[in-house]
Amino acid sequence: RKDYSWPGGRRLALCITTNIECFAFGKGRGHDNAKHGEPQTQRNYSWRDYGNRVGIWRFFDMFDELKLPAAHNTNSLLYDYAPQIFDAIRRRHDEIVAHGRTNAENLRDFMWEEDEARVIKDVTDTFTGNERSAPKGWMGAGTYENSTTPDLLKEAGYKYLMDWPCDDQPIWMRTRAGPLLCVPYPAEINDS
């Protein structure tokens, strides 16, 4: 395939991305490597809660020390749960990538296109209202989506999505509203 070059003649680009997620204890989905398909437990809740209380702050310290920019796939309900995380993201001038409302639900929970469009709008409006600009990127909770999700994201103004781990470089996807950039997410190194 065609050689892919980055601006300035650079040959390599790296996307540093964290997933900052929130869950209500005992409600909705809660992935657990040890017990697939079982309801959420204190183990998978506390594992994720640790990330918001301790883990993300260690990442921020490391990113600051190494002077690395980052993008953060972030649930919109986090504004209610841990708004101090957004203060740190703003201070660092990092990018916020919309990541659904909560990882206790995903877009496959919404069977009708209109329902999914409302969820995308709700998430987008929450970020826009808090950050004064809409997020450019989207990664669905659990990287789940429906057959029309790329169409709905493009129609909602998104420039890229990260739900397709289909390549080692960005690719363009066709949608009914025009091209949408797919930035492949390395699912094989995700902590879940």
Give residue spans per PLM region.
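Aromatic-anchored helix/helix-loop segment that forms the rim or "lid"
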Residues: 190-192
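Catalytic alpha-helical scaffold of carbohydrate-active enzymes acting on polysaccharides/glycoconjugates
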Residues: 1-182, 187
